[in-house]
Amino acid sequence: MGARASVLSGGELDKWEKIRLRPGGKKKYRLKHIVWASRELERFAVNPGLLETSEGCRQILGQLQPSLQTGSEELRSLYNTVATLYCVHQRIEKKDTKEALDKIEEEQNKCKKKAQQAAADTGNSSQVSQNYPIVQNLQGQMVHQAISPRTLNAWVKVVEEKAFSPEVIPMFSALSEGATPQDLNTMLNTVGGHQAAMQMLKETINEEAAEWDRLHPVHAGPIAPGQMREPRGSDIAGTTSTLQEQIGWMTNNPPIPVGEIYKRWIILGLNKIVRMYSPTSILDIRQGPKEPFRDYVDRFYKTLRAEQATQEVKNWMTETLLVQNANPDCKTILKALGPAATLEEMMTACQGVGGPGHKARVLAEAMSQVTNPTTIMMQKGNFRNQRKT
């Protein structure tokens, strides 16, 4: 509790304990509310140290606000507590939680108007958000919007449900869009089990970091005034760099996209893990005699994602093996379509292959190819002399 008590100084704590939970109510904020908020933030994988400053509280509020409409009562209580704490840090006198929330809303409206005005002045409405989650605050500084609990929960749920099947990689890529190395480490740290897989991932990251250092040796001499130091492999992995340094590299001119570089290393490691969890080779994926073409394509692409190959090689695998390993019925149709056929055309053409409707059509075509003379002979011999005397 001692560490959490340091969130407020003595004078601030006095002000905190004078604020009522509800307008006209008797209950007031106590130290236990800060302790509870810290624990809740830890549960959401958010650094509780952010509660110690007004800027940190602002970041937490920005992170929680999108979830308020659909969030639980605990989430609303956490938002209210942080909003009140923000006002105490800012030395804004408030009697209760509602007044604190009104103040937050007022500041957010002002911020929105200034952002809209700035966008109108520059003629570029995307200027504020183009580097999200790194955004520009009212003072013109580039600040970081921490990864949201909703994103973290989605990531944890994917790993729990899918383990490390191939679809985990595109999901990780989507959820970590624009993330800093700190965000990426937060995502990795939320994975509770699968420690063997996480150790493999760590080894891959260390290998890539060492390779980065080999290809990007440190320049001799002092750093020029106003310039940032060059990131080392461990900086990119977020172990020896601060969040401010990461933001600086990512927003510098020209930028060094440490987040994207680290993300590539992680995806490389995830590919190795997926390969271990899904040992089936793409060469082994063949369409069963009665398997619908759609199901075969699903299995094919799921395994293809786990293949450790360049995109060019994967394209070749798709163009060659998808047709080559189809069952005879589908293969005949696909070869007739030609090599330029799209996947949509293939799936449309092979729809229903193997089913009773397809078999009936094949039988009808075979019957239509019977020569006319044979048909006539069969008709001439209609039931003649069938009854023996």
Curated annotation (Swiss-Prot):
Keyword presence, Ribonucleoprotein: no
Modified residues (Asymmetric dimethylarginine): 387
Chain residue ranges for the region called Interaction with host PPIA/CYPA and NUP153: 189-227
GO cellular component annotations of the record: host cell nucleus; host cell plasma membrane; host multivesicular body; membrane; viral nucleocapsid; virion membrane
Region (Interaction with host AP3D1): 12-19
Lipidation (N-myristoyl glycine): 2
Post-translational modification: Capsid protein p24 is phosphorylated possibly by host MAPK1; this phosphorylation is necessary for Pin1-mediated virion uncoating.
Segments carrying motif Nuclear localization signal: 26-32
GO BP term (any one): viral translational frameshifting
Binding partners and assembly: Gag polyprotein: Homotrimer; further assembles as hexamers of trimers. Oligomerization possibly creates a central hole into which the cytoplasmic tail of the gp41 envelope protein may be inserted. Gag polyprotein: Interacts with host TRIM22; this interaction seems to disrupt proper trafficking of Gag polyprotein and may interfere with budding. Gag polyprotein: Interacts with host PDZD8. Matrix protein p17: Homotrimer; further assembles as hexamers of trimers. Matrix protein p17: Interacts with gp41 (via C-terminus).
Name of this protein: Gag polyprotein
Source organism phylogeny: Viruses, Riboviria, Pararnavirae, Artverviricota, Revtraviricetes
